[in-house]
Regions:
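Active-site-adjacent substrate/metal-binding segments within catalytic domains
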Residues: 17-19, 30-32, 54, 111
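Alpha-amylase-like alpha-glycosidases and glucanotransferases acting on alpha-linked glucans and related
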Residues: 6-13, 20, 64-211, 236-407
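Generic start-of-chain signal for non-secretory N-termini
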Residues: 1-26, 42
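Conserved, mostly hydrophobic/aromatic
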Residues: 44, 54, 162, 221, ...
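Conserved, well-ordered alpha-helix/loop/beta-strand core segments that scaffold catalytic motifs
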Residues: 203, 207-236
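Short, acidic/polar
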Residues: 32-43, 290-300
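Catalytic domains of carbohydrate-active enzymes, especially glycoside hydrolases
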Residues: 35-60, 304-305
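Acidic, mature catalytic/reactive cores of soluble proteins
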Residues: 2-4, 9, 45, 182, ...
Length: 407
């Protein structure tokens, strides 16, 4: 792989493990950013490995998929370390008396979300209790870090209002809200912020906890010579803060409904293709804004990781646009995307070689390969695919190109 972001290190080989934090061992239903994560980093170091790859770390929405987050920026509150909150005296042992008996084989996310959300809200109430004099209340450095996070995270206000708005509407998607919040004017937005101020504070608090814990963990890994490989989906969920707050950047009608949605055409694996349903980008508008939203997204993600895998890389070259309302992906069409222009702008803005891994699996044509190679981005090789048609198979190790990542 190419050199790390912002460093002058020569390219070297990286070897590691792909393991999402939720799969780490721990006592609270799923893995967290606590002791289990630190032990895993120690294990990587002892094993002579230098890379930890994770799935997208976003705040998951419907279906609990990391590839359908509520936000391109917000982190997953379910992996906040509850033991860390004990250390901050925001939670106590007696708060865990009614903890469910977790199934070691399968996660009941409904039960998990109810349990952890209750504890996070309890921690938030204590965070604002000035009568407490221990833990975080006796740590000016932690309080300053919280204030700095809230001041510098330009995405945080919209995220907090969006999530508080969803709670206010019992989880209803934003495109079914009343007009003064679905497409609010500046004044209407200010009114809702005042109305939902306390609820918004909770979401800012949990995002600070996630960011603080994850960046502390990342520093621990980096200090031991372990690089973090992050991951993001190319498209955003329809019911996400990014679509709600930036409707002109997506192909939506006047009511907030997509005119076309994402997917892939029919192929060897599916006679009807794949209908993902994500709203597609209005690339003309992104180009007019200098790709500001995308640049902010990539820049922020690179504070959380050293390399970044982007799912469905081919969508930067051409994307499959399916008319909204179709039941399959058959009636879509390929539409050009501004791949070269976009990555040129991204590279110029970052000021160094892009530390991006291109997920280039599936039906890939020459123009996708040219885009990938023009910017020196490593593609992916999957050994599991190596033994179909072994005479001519790019996934066999002796056929690998030099700049690639093998799984």
């Amino acid at each position: 792989m190419a050199e790390e972001a912002g460093t002058s290190k020569k390219p070297k080989k990286y070897t590691g493990i792909l393991l999402h934090p939720t799969s780490l061992p721990g006592p609270y239903g799923i893995g967290e950013l606590g002791a289990g994560a630190y032990r895993f980093i120690d294990f990587l170091e002892r094993s002579g490995l230098n890379t930890w790859q994770v799935l997208p770390l976003g705040h998951t929405g419907f279906g609990d998929s990391p590839y359908q987050p509520f936000s391109a920026f917000a982190g997953q509150p379910l992996i906040i370390s509850l033991d860390h909150l004990k250390e901050l005296h925001l939670l106590y042992d007696e708060d865990f008396r009614d903890m469910p008996a977790w199934n070691a084989e399968q996660i009941n996310y409904g039960e998990l979300i109810e349990f952890k959300t209750g504890l996070l809200k309890l921690a938030y109430s204590r965070f604002h209790d000035e009568s407490l004099s221990d833990g975080i209340h006796d740590d000016p450095e932690m309080k300053q870090a919280y204030d700095n996070f809230c001041e510098t995270s330009v995405w945080l206000e919209d995220y907090a209002l969006f999530m508080a708005g969803k709670d206010y509407h019992q989880g209803m998607p934003w495109y079914m809200w009343e007009d003064n919040l679905k497409k609010p004017t500046k004044k209407q937005k200010e009114t809702w912020v005042k109305k939902l101020d306390t609820e918004m504070g909770y979401y800012k608090f949990i995002q600070f906890l996630f960011y603080y814990e994850w960046t502390t963990l990342k520093k621990y890994a980096n200090d031991k010579g372990i690089s973090i490989v992050g991951d993001i989906p190319i498209f955003m969920a329809w019911d996400s803060v990014d679509v709600w707050a930036n409707q002109s950047l997506f192909q939506l009608d006047s009511k907030g409904y997509p005119t076309v949605v994402a997917g892939v055409p029919p192929d060897y694996f599916s006679a009807t293709g794949q209908l993902w349903g994500n709203p597609l980008y209005n690339w003309k508008k992104h180009t007019e804004t200098g790709y500001e939203w995308w640049l902010n997204r990539i820049r922020y993600q690179l504070t959380l990781c050293d390399f970044l895998r982007i799912d469905h890389f081919r969508g930067f070259d051409k994307y499959w646009a399916i008319p909204y309302g179709e039941e399959t992906a058959i009636n879509g069409k390929w539409v050009e995307a501004p791949g070269v222009n976009f990555f040129t702008q991204l590279e110029a803005t970052l000021g160094y070689h892009l530390p991006i891994i291109a997920e280039d699996l599936g039906e890939i044509d020459d123009s996708v390969i040219e885009l990938r190679d023009k910017f020196g981005l490593p593609g992916m090789k999957v050994l599991q695919f190596a033994f179909e048609n072994p005479e001519e198979n790019d996934f066999l190790p002796h056929n690998f190109v030099r700049n690639c990542v093998c799984y």
